[in-house]
């Protein structure tokens, strides 16, 4: 096995121009490398730049600064030897399974006989033998995603990039396809030498990956790297597996060092009037508080456990948990979600008392809500144009 890296990213930065001439920084200071025989996971919430980084690696976009190297050479444009499987099935509906798979070879001016041979081999490898003449509309979601895998593998890439390839599938179909992929990888039956998997499913990352890079947001950056040394096949119920999942939850909910004045960490994060608020409904907040307040959690829940119980992934759970923390209804600490005294009171209150508690916390801890309330109270009509507040908020964009 060659010890030199298949892929290297050195100080990669990506920014997009904004209408006012400033730039929106999406990725900053990205340093990573992928070596032969590795499955590397990029784990983080939506908006942390994982998919953007994947497109830079594939040559579908250019970095604003830094360099991506494949086999020691800079990536400039789509790189032959790197293939991608997308979250959506991305199939041409007017083409058959065979034609969709063969499409990747058509542009390589390959002899027709070789195209047919390799396409049929990829279709058979991924478990679609007998469906060569079927159209995408005739296939289930899992089968359509298998076509996506076959189309990527038919070009015999060295590196396979997977952008949340299982997230659009139901739980059982995703588990089957994930297991089949790992079996093919372990048996060495696929032509690929390395894999980069983008996911926001912590258990999926621990189940599949040898290394996990945990991403932070605004801008996207690598917070930590976690090596997974558990033998394959991995068991979700194994204590070592659960410990690693717990460790990642702790990493992703840890407060930044020096977050408070003078380097002191604040117990609760604060908001400004222009802070971007999580898009979370009060019914979801109420539901999570009720779940944590009830047995067996009784006010303090282990995040992996509550996520499993409620069938929520990190992109669903974290915004809700963080909103509860912003409103002082709960505290995130060490991978746990602990309700405050007011959070417990809310969970056990009737509907009218809940409204009073929620209003009190909303006005106390969300400056924008307090500002809107103050403006309305100052007016005899108790009304104001929406554009007034939008104009004010534009100063923070």
Predicted regions, residues:
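Hydrophobic anchor residue at the start of the ABC signature
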Residues: 85, 149
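Helix-to-loop junction immediately C-terminal to a conserved catalytic motif
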Residues: 58
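Short coil-to-helix segment of the ABC ATPase nucleotide-binding domain corresponding to the Q-loop/switch region
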Residues: 95-102
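Conserved ABC transporter NBD signature motif
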Residues: 66-77
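Conserved ABC ATPase "signature" region
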Residues: 102, 106, 113-131, 180-183
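The feature captures the beta-strand-to-loop junction immediately N-terminal to the Walker
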Residues: 43-45
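Conserved signature/switch motifs of ABC ATPase nucleotide-binding domains
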Residues: 134-137, 155
């Amino acid at each position: 096995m060659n010890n030199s890296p298949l892929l290297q990213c050195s100080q990669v930065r990506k920014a997009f121009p904004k209408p006012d001439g400033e730039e929106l920084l999406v990725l900053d200071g990205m340093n990573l490398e992928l070596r032969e025989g590795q499955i590397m996971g990029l784990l983080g919430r939506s908006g942390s730049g994982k998919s953007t980084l994947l497109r830079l690696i594939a040559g579908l976009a250019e970095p604003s600064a830094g360099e991506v190297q494949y086999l020691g050479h800079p990536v400039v444009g789509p790189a032959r030897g790197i293939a991608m499987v997308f979250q959506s099935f991305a199939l041409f509906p007017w083409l058959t399974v065979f034609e969709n798979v063969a499409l990747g070879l058509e542009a390589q001016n390959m002899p027709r006989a070789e195209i047919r041979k390799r396409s049929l081999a990829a279709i058979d490898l991924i478990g679609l033998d007998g469906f060569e003449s079927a159209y995408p509309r005739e296939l289930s979601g899992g089968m359509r995603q298998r076509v996506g895998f076959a189309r990527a593998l038919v070009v015999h890439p060295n590196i396979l990039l997977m952008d949340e390839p299982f997230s659009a599938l139901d739980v059982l179909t995703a588990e089957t396809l994930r297991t089949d992929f790992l079996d093919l990888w372990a048996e060495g039956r696929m032509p690929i030498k390395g894999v980069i998997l983008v996911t926001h499913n912590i258990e999926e990352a621990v189940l599949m990956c040898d290394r996990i890079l945990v991403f932070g947001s605004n801008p996207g950056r690598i917070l930590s790297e976690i090596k997974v040394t558990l033998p394959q096949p991995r068991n979700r119920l194994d204590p070592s597996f659960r410990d690693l999942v717990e460790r990642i939850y702790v990493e992703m909910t840890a407060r930044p060092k020096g977050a408070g004045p003078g380097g002191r960490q604040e117990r609760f994060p604060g908001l400004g009037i222009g802070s971007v608020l999580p898009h979370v409904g009060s019914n979801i907040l109420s539901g999570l508080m009720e779940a944590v307040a009830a047995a067996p959690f009784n006010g303090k829940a282990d995040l992996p456990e509550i996520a499993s119980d409620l069938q929520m992934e990190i992109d669903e759970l974290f915004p809700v948990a963080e909103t509860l923390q912003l409103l002082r209804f709960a505290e995130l600490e060490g991978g746990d979600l602990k309700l405050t005294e007011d959070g417990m009171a809310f969970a056990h209150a009737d509907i009218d008392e809940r409204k009073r508690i929620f209003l009190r916390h909303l006005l106390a801890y969300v400056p924008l809500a307090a500002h809107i309330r103050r403006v309305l109270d100052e007016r005899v009509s108790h009304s104001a144009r929406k554009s007034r507040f939008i104009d004010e908020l534009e100063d923070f964009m």
